[in-house]
Amino acid sequence: MAQTAMIIGASRGIGLGLVRELAARGWRVIASERSHSAGLHDVARERPGQVEIVTADVTDRVQIDALRAAGTPKSLDVLLVNAGIWDAQPVDEASDADLLRIMRVNAAGPIGTARILLPLVRDGGILAFTTSRMGSIADSSGGSELYRMSKAAQNMLARGVFVQTAKPRGIPVLSLHPGWVRTEMGGDNAPVGVAESAHGLADVLSKAHPLDHHFLDYTGAELPW
């Protein structure tokens, strides 16, 4: 039987690349978009019956609740929450609105979404988040403070989801650094292509992992918290 993954945030970039990669490996993929994504709909047309498109925004509780209500409990092998925005401002130069926005999109939104949708993941499945090694406290070179802060917060909150909810059901939690990828957010100078990152992430998601909260990059290497 084909494995099933739900990818929240699949309109473009890494999320879209992962939809393509998993579908090519025979997975069934439920992929979310906030607004119409031509690229995602192209993949769905190429993979009829294999790629299903849903609407979801991690900052919209009504949409996420509706997605859970429409889903089948314990039907997913993998739930990956892929959401993020970039803001390199120092914290002392950011407005209150900037602070709230990046924390909502990069930390609170993905974690809240995961908590709502976790009942759709089978016992022993995988819950994953796209994070960044820039959220590492042990390996920080400084700068880009808003972004680093938000990803460190996401990592901490993901630990709470693991301890409180996922661990009792045998679900490991993966906080995944996809690499510095050539996307709209990563820019043209990034050294890693979308296909390379997606291939590595798919390998990581396809493997069994010890029951813990893991901080890994797209090659499967452990990263320091």
Predicted stretch roles:
Residues 85, 90-100, 111, 123-167:
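Catalytic loop of short-chain dehydrogenase/reductase
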Residues 25-40:
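Conserved glycine-rich Rossmann-like NAD(P)H-binding loop of the short-chain dehydrogenase/reductase
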Residues 11, 15-20:
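N-terminal Rossmann NAD(P)H-binding glycine-rich loop of SDR-like oxidoreductase domains
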Residues 7-8, 81-82, 126-132, 172-177:
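Structural signature of the Rossmann-like NAD(P)-dependent dehydrogenase/reductase core
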Residues 46-62:
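Rossmann-fold cofactor-recognition segment
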Residues 59-74:
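Conserved Rossmann-fold cofactor-binding substructure of NAD(P)-dependent oxidoreductases
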Residues 171, 175-178, 183, 187-225:
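C-terminal helical subdomain
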